[in-house]
Amino acid sequence: MAECGRGAAGGALPTSPSPALGAKGALKAGAGEGGGGGGGGRLGHGRARYDSGGVSNGDCSLGVSGDEARTSPGRGPLGVALARTPSPAAGPVPRDSKPGGLPRRSSIIKDGTKQKRERKKTVSFSSMPTEKKISSASDCINSMVEGSELKKVRSNSRIYHRYFLLDADMQSLRWEPSKKDSEKAKIDIKSIKEVRTGKNTDIFRSNGISEQISEDCAFSVIYGENYESLDLVANSADVANIWVTGLRYLISYGKHTLDMLESSQDNMRTSWISQMFSEIDVDGLGHITLCHAVQCIRNLNPGLKTSKIELKFKELHKSKDKAGTEITKEEFIEVFHELCTRPEIYFLLVQFSSNKEFLDTKDLMMFLEAEQGVAHINEEISLEIIHKYEPSKEGQEKGWLSIDGFTNYLMSPDCYIFDPEHKKVCQDMKQPLSHYFINSSHNTYLIEDQFRGPSDITGYIRALKMGCRSVELDVWDGPDNEPVIYTGHTMTSQIVFRSVIDIINKYAFFASEYPLILCLENHCSIKQQKVMVQHMKKILGDKLYTTSPNMEESYLPSPDVLKGKILIKAKKLSSNCSGVEGDVTDEDEGAEMSQRMGKENVEQPNHVPVKRFQLCKELSELVSICKSVQFKEFQVSFQVQKYWEVCSFNEVLASKYANENPGDFVNYNKRFLARVFPSPMRIDSSNMNPQDFWKCGCQIVAMNFQTPGLMMDLNVGWFRQNGNCGYVLRPAIMREEVSFFSANTKDSVPGVSPQLLHIKIISGQNFPKPKGSGAKGDVVDPYVYVEIHGIPADCAEQRTKTVNQNGDAPIFDESFEFQINLPELAMVRFVVLDDDYIGDEFIGQYTIPFECLQTGYRHVPLQSLTGEVLAHASLFVHVAITNRRGGGKPHKRGLSVRKGKKSREYASLRTLWIKTVDEVFKNAQPPIRDATDLRENMQNAVVSFKELCGLSSVANLMQCMLAVSPRFLGPDNNPLVVLNLSEPYPTMELQAIVPEVLKKIVTTYDMMMQSLKALIENADAVYEKIVHCQKAAMEFHEHLHSIGTKEGLKERKLQKAVESFTWNITILKGQADLLKYAKNETLENLKQIHFAAVSCGLNKPGTENSEAQKPRRSLEAIPEKASDENGD
């Protein structure tokens, strides 16, 4: 991949460009891994400065210029108790507005061309105005009464700027029309059926300009008996959230809204904060010192800076013209509300709390099941979470989770993005050693550069504690007959060999019980070689693995078999050597590299001299299943190399093979271990990109652990996924004897279903200033990059907008989508940078394997350049994965995306021109088509149902059932539609006459259920047919060459036939796996429907043993009909 990561230190190797190197977007690839926080390197990319046309992903404005903007009519805030704080939502008045007048006709937008906005740096000695927080429904209602400019979307691809506001009596939503009667430009609140988030109406889906509109800024009001839609776009996701939350509150409480808002002021949270105040005010004076107030708030929210809390109190006193520093209870509560409420979490809470100010156990259960994908949840588990994270005693006793408890929970390790299943060994450890990637260190003894840097045993301690399973010992003759370790022919310092072996003995299995490989580069005399042997035997003892390889085997032993063993990788005397010593080729990687590259540049490689040295038999006998040999070429290795022989490749040579012989390299690594080490030209100890070699199956990619940056981030992140044990099982397509895979593919992988990764960057918390920044003050202008690292087809990146002058609680609210073609080899990297940097822009990063992602709302704990956790610094994100395979992780939700029938593509098998074999593959075509039809019919039906429910394809069926459940209730709260759960495939049964829109939902549900039933009942038979064809074809595998020769195929055609055979076998296995995963996904869908029906009380009486739960108003639902736009 192009080295697109930010904040990495070190220099690139000019002679070894990454094979996928290239510019993406406005980025320009340059030398170096990137110049991060003090690493001394150069930036790997030019910094991205995008001025994209149209609507940017996060800045939801559609770019009105000049007189296309209009001013707000200047409404004041509510004059009732709900107007506790000024609104943060109305937004600034456009510069070019026309005061007091109606907007001109040019407010119609026909395209989304965005004008470049000026950005001026300012210095402020007070809080930023945008820091005013939404902390309750009253804040939302107050903001709506003040009004906001929103964009109104019509079906003709036109967009109108209108000023929307809520009437002071909270009975109607109205907007300023351009020419029509103002009475037609309003909607009664009581007529609103639903408020839908995102672009999930027919108007949005069919609109030509929809692609330019951010999903996070769009929402729709469904109203009237005909379910018309008013489709709107806010200037920011925050404004959209305010309107959605406020309108839903109004729908829920109707004429009782004011009473509810007034009563909510004296809520559980306020009581708890008051109690905190009273515990400090022990004398009952009614006030506390500023110091005590600041310390209390910091104790409750450790991420807040003392200076920021003090500033808030001082601003409050200044606004009241109050002298002194004493803090009253009311002031303490007000500042706490403002500083400790995260609006994005408040908006999330009210989605699941039916607009209460807290979550009860059932609300929390629904959140965990529907959003977080937690299986087997019950009220007891919900109560445990509440008791663990709810700070107030009242909440714990009542089983209520307040906004503070919910925030505590979401920020806890329980809700980190990393799947805790992967914190322990979770992969099959009984495969041959060659089937694993192995965490490997190069020049382990160095703690700086490899030319003049110091050597130290702490390098070994650090690497072994990090789970490294392959370390390097470059051994030379030392004084006093004691071998030493250092980089030969350089000015690096020396350490005694014996002390290193002592440290290895102590820490070898500190982080992992699986085998440790010692890569010996032996340059010692015979005399000191014997000293090496004595030290290793005496210190390591039985840990040394010296068992001779089994000649009858074809593969190396497994990590499981080799637990607790230390393997020596080094040169070994030939078996016919009878003396006590013999000569072998030199081990100097630098010298060997010169020879290898020399061979590539001359016509007669035999003329290149090979250096040799003497090896003693005792040292040779310590080498068992990791015998070092020189690589010749792939075809020679396939024929003569033994499975216990290991070849080392310089990165330049390995890159050459990766680019020119990717298929051979992958096949070679199925049986043999390959070690790739950095070029000696990297004198600054910079790192190569390990992904360039992992994608070819290379197991031992040696990294300079002492050099932080992007490449080490990838290495460290990658090996987290299997309990950090140092071994990661390679993808099946890299292990199977017959499989078709090219490391450099820029398309989908045969037999592997692509996954769609949806990531929403919601907000950030407590970003520190870059360590190497030369700018004064603590202000940062953060933005976030999301990078995908993997095979070339998967390498991609996206960035958010910059949030100016807010590193404490920036709101990004931007969504990105990535197609992942080989999920098992993909990694996701979050990088936070400062857009106003001097000298250093790197704030923090987090790198995670795709397979370790947890879906739902998650926090990403940020790490420094050197890998330390940044205290309290995190990103808040939402993750969804669609069309994810369903096996192995039942708690992960399998989701699907729809493909139209016209675009349906069936997997194609290739012709070998070998009649008997082609006949077998021909028989496989019908079941492949059947499997595809079963899968895609199910996926299409599910997505159709999601759309009718007003949800996107990212939603799951549980969320769909929650969305439609309120509309299935009649005026008397009795269900109009129930689900009969006594049948294997639950049916919807009408209990009364229902509107056409509900009938359409029921009909679409029935069609979906039929597709689910068809897949479940037919999948096994189709699967068996595909597997039978695969087995029948494999019977030809061993003798395919001879069969092809008899058919008259010559060399090139014969090779093509073998390749086609491998392709076909890969396709058959992939299709069988996809069908199996689809069946698991379908069974999961049925479980979700069942659970949701019971939770919403929509199950037919007597069809479910669980006590029917009281139906609760959901937040989504019902298809709509486009509005006639009477109020334009």
UniProtKB/Swiss-Prot annotation:
Could you say which tissues express the protein in this record?
A: Ubiquitously expressed, with a strong expression in skeletal muscle.
Question: Could you tell me which residue ranges the PI-PLC Y-box domain spans?
Answer: 619-735
PTM Phosphothreonine: at which residues? 85, 585
In the record, N-acetylalanine modifications are located at 2
Entry-linked InterPro entries: C2_dom, C2_domain_sf, EF-hand-dom_pair, PH-like_dom_sf, PH_domain, PI-PLC_fam, PLC-like_Pdiesterase_TIM-brl, PLC_EF-hand-like
Ranges for region Disordered? 1-129, 1100-1128
Q: Which key words are in the record? A: Acetylation, Cytoplasm, Phosphoprotein, Transducer
- What GO biological process terms are annotated to this protein in UniProt? B cell proliferation involved in immune response; B-1a B cell differentiation; gamma-aminobutyric acid signaling pathway; intracellular signal transduction; lipid metabolic process; negative regulation of B cell receptor signaling pathway; negative regulation of cold-induced thermogenesis; regulation of synaptic transmission, GABAergic
**Pfam families recorded for this chain?**
C2 (PF00168), EF-hand_like (PF09279), PH_12 (PF16457), PI-PLC-X (PF00388), PI-PLC-Y (PF00387)
- Coiled-coil intervals, chain numbering: none
Spell out which residues are annotated as carrying Phosphoserine: 16, 1114
PANTHER family, alphabetically?
Answer: INACTIVE PHOSPHOLIPASE C-LIKE PROTEIN 2 (PTHR10336:SF84), PHOSPHOINOSITIDE-SPECIFIC PHOSPHOLIPASE C FAMILY PROTEIN (PTHR10336)
Q: What does this protein do?
A: May play an role in the regulation of Ins(1,4,5)P3 around the endoplasmic reticulum.
Q: Please report the name of this protein according to its UniProt entry.
A: Inactive phospholipase C-like protein 2
According to its UniProt entry, this protein's organism is Mus musculus (Mouse)
